[in-house]
Amino acid sequence: MLRERTVRLQYGSRVEAVYVLGTYLWTDVYSAAPAGAQTFSLKHSEHVWVEVVRDGEAEEVATNGKQRWLLSPSTTLRVTMSQASTEASSDKVTVNYYDEEGSIPIDQAGLFLTAIEISLDVDADRDGVVEKNNPKKASWTWGPEGQGAILLVNCDRETPWLPKEDCRDEKVYSKEDLKDMSQMILRTKGPDRLPAGYEIVLYISMSDSDKVGVFYVENPFFGQRYIHILGRRKLYHVVKYTGGSAELLFFVEGLCFPDEGFSGLVSIHVSLLEYMAQDIPLTPIFTDTVIFRIAPWIMTPNILPPVSVFVCCMKDNYLFLKEVKNLVEKTNCELKVCFQYLNRGDRWIQDEIEFGYIEAPHKGFPVVLDSPRDGNLKDFPVKELLGPDFGYVTREPLFESVTSLDSFGNLEVSPPVTVNGKTYPLGRILIGSSFPLSGGRRMTKVVRDFLKAQQVQAPVELYSDWLTVGHVDEFMSFVPIPGTKKFLLLMASTSACYKLFREKQKDGHGEAIMFKGLGGMSSKRITINKILSNESLVQENLYFQRCLDWNRDILKKELGLTEQDIIDLPALFKMDEDHRARAFFPNMVNMIVLDKDLGIPKPFGPQVEEECCLEMHVRGLLEPLGLECTFIDDISAYHKFLGEVHCGTNVRRKPFTFKWWHMVP
């Protein structure tokens, strides 16, 4: 901010200047002196404070003008004022010049001042209230003691008949829309009018013009008008000076999220401009600046309480839908069914969208991230989710091809973790990628850049390209430990499956049949003995376990986990024609987590004493922790199409109680 400026005096004339409270005026009395002048004296008004500065030493000046000072090239005056003027040019500083012997001034110079107060204010201390002239308002710092205002992307839709998000136009249709915006106040105080030629201007830079918008509310006789004054094509706005003590209220909206090449910081400035002469540009004599950070999009991990469970209604999933409904009824959340007219035959609701939220001190709301997958569910997030206090954002590649890894079964987030002393209070984003140097499939760069730019959930890339579908939710999930703030990582494990089957074979259950009661599948009599004797299947799953262990090591390193934090769930895979893995039986780790209630794919494992040994094993691992296991039959409606329970459902969860601005990325 411009807090000091120079005013040039001229002997024998009167110079008028507008002074802004909180700044300094400097003037060179030596250069303004008439020929022959040797000393000078000063007089000033009651509310003006003047210092004579010589060789870096300052001396306060009394108001009566009796004291004399020698003129020298190093002598300057520093002028400040204590309060706003009541009339234009009513405060003054008079410099009297004297020759070597005279007691009567040979000439004088006058500085006539109009003091005004200008302050552009925001909620820099993040308490939900716009305070006055916070000294930290022009900077932004992270942490619990941090300072700096916060802005929401206005990505919801308050008016149902509009086709797009509120931030996509330059209009405000209701007061509800203003509540999504951050308030900014321009406070002024001074005489009824300013000297001729002065202007107060709000402005933004060209680089910020597509990232922030500002509205002003007028109150004409016939109701309020919401006027768009800054953003997009509008870079500046002249503010009418009203005189006296005034507060002009503005509403600021974010237009886009942090992303590659955009840190999330935007600046808004107010300047006082001075008129010199016709055809001469106005000169800024004072500038005040505020900085906002646009709130990041934040994902919610499994440990947070569920709000809504989403599932698609298909021609072939009636029983699955019924079982999911029964599971949801055990919790405090609601079931939302996406019917066929909207899903158009697309059952993979997990792959189409990811729920998250944005938050500022004054407000927060959920925001859905729409994947570039764009299956037949592509209209669902805009038609059914986007609305009042429910935002929407998407990222689509311009030139890259979209692969299965761009579906959001390949996008998860861990619970809060601490890694080598570094805390991630909102967890870390987890995405699947290709094996290093393999040149395989990878999530498109535009989505990866977006996730990284949010800063608060630093992404970790895992290796998922070894799977046919290639999603991280095929080999991992997080579950809470009820009654604590702790969690466990569940990982698919082929070695755990072979170990369990060998134990059952040793106990005399080698002829136990898998897929019992499933018609054609059970007629093949797939037994424990056949699985253990299938050498090619054994070798394939040794390779798949190496892929799982690669991810296990990454997760332990990047999330600060130990073996005690991980539970292995039995899984088997078979290799497809591209040498990638698909589940041999329903993959139990691909579950839905609703607090302590887990909806787990029913594995149809070997029947030992008329019970599925896989279900018994998993219950024995999880239920002693306080978790409740419900096994859901998804084999015909999802498993045979290479997905499971998690792939066919989606959960919106409550936001973190932790405020993202309190962390240090």
UniProtKB/Swiss-Prot annotation:
Pfam families, sorted: PAD (PF03068), PAD_M (PF08527), PAD_N (PF08526)
Protein name according to UniProt: Protein-arginine deiminase type-2
Annotated binding of Ca(2+) 5, by residue: E354, F408, L411, E412
Consequence when changing Q350A: Strongly reduced enzyme activity
Mutation effect (C647A): Loss of enzyme activity
Native organism: Homo sapiens
Domain of life: Eukaryota
Location (main, coarse): cytoplasm
Record gene name: PADI2
